[in-house]
């Protein structure tokens, strides 16, 4: 009986340690706001070029999107 109590206690302790390692700090990601680029001209073919123009406008990045392929700048709200 004493052996089984020790075994159950050890198994429960290992289980709690295993669960606790998966419960690290939770990070919350900021929302991303988008705004149409004012300086990008023409259809947006390269997301890299769009991101460079948006960096010059003071944004964090940019991407091409939409049917008409426009450049939209992105930043954290």
Swiss-Prot record:
<dbReference type="GO" id="GO:0031640">
    <property type="term" value="P:killing of cells of another organism"/>
</dbReference>
<dbReference type="InterPro" id="IPR036574">
    <property type="entry name" value="Scorpion_toxin-like_sf"/>
</dbReference>
<dbReference type="InterPro" id="IPR008176">
    <property type="entry name" value="Defensin_plant"/>
</dbReference>
<dbReference type="GO" id="GO:0005739">
    <property type="term" value="C:mitochondrion"/>
</dbReference>
<feature type="disulfide bond">
    <location>
        <begin position="54"/>
        <end position="73"/>
    </location>
</feature>
<keyword id="KW-0611">Plant defense</keyword>
<comment type="similarity">
    <text>Belongs to the DEFL family.</text>
</comment>
<dbReference type="GO" id="GO:0050832">
    <property type="term" value="P:defense response to fungus"/>
</dbReference>
<feature type="disulfide bond">
    <location>
        <begin position="50"/>
        <end position="71"/>
    </location>
</feature>
<dbReference type="InterPro" id="IPR003614">
    <property type="entry name" value="Scorpion_toxin-like"/>
</dbReference>
<dbReference type="Pfam" id="PF00304">
    <property type="entry name" value="Gamma-thionin"/>
</dbReference>
<keyword id="KW-0732">Signal</keyword>
<dbReference type="GO" id="GO:0005576">
    <property type="term" value="C:extracellular region"/>
</dbReference>
<keyword id="KW-0929">Antimicrobial</keyword>
<feature type="disulfide bond">
    <location>
        <begin position="44"/>
        <end position="64"/>
    </location>
</feature>
<keyword id="KW-0295">Fungicide</keyword>
<dbReference type="GO" id="GO:0009506">
    <property type="term" value="C:plasmodesma"/>
</dbReference>
<feature type="signal peptide">
    <location>
        <begin position="1"/>
        <end position="30"/>
    </location>
</feature>
<dbReference type="GO" id="GO:0006952">
    <property type="term" value="P:defense response"/>
</dbReference>
<protein>
    <recommendedName>
        <fullName>Defensin-like protein 1</fullName>
    </recommendedName>
</protein>
<comment type="function">
    <text>Confers broad-spectrum resistance to pathogens.</text>
</comment>
<keyword id="KW-1015">Disulfide bond</keyword>
<keyword id="KW-0964">Secreted</keyword>
<feature type="disulfide bond">
    <location>
        <begin position="33"/>
        <end position="77"/>
    </location>
</feature>
């Amino acid at each position: 009986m004493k052996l089984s109590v020790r075994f159950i206690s050890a198994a429960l302790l290992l289980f709690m340690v295993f669960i606790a390692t998966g419960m690290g700090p939770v990070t919350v990601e900021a929302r991303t706001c988008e705004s149409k680029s004012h300086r990008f001209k023409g259809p947006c073919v390269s997301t890299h070029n769009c991101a460079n123009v948006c960096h010059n406008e003071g944004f964090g990045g940019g991407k091409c999107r939409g049917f008409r392929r426009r450049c939209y700048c992105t930043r954290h709200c």
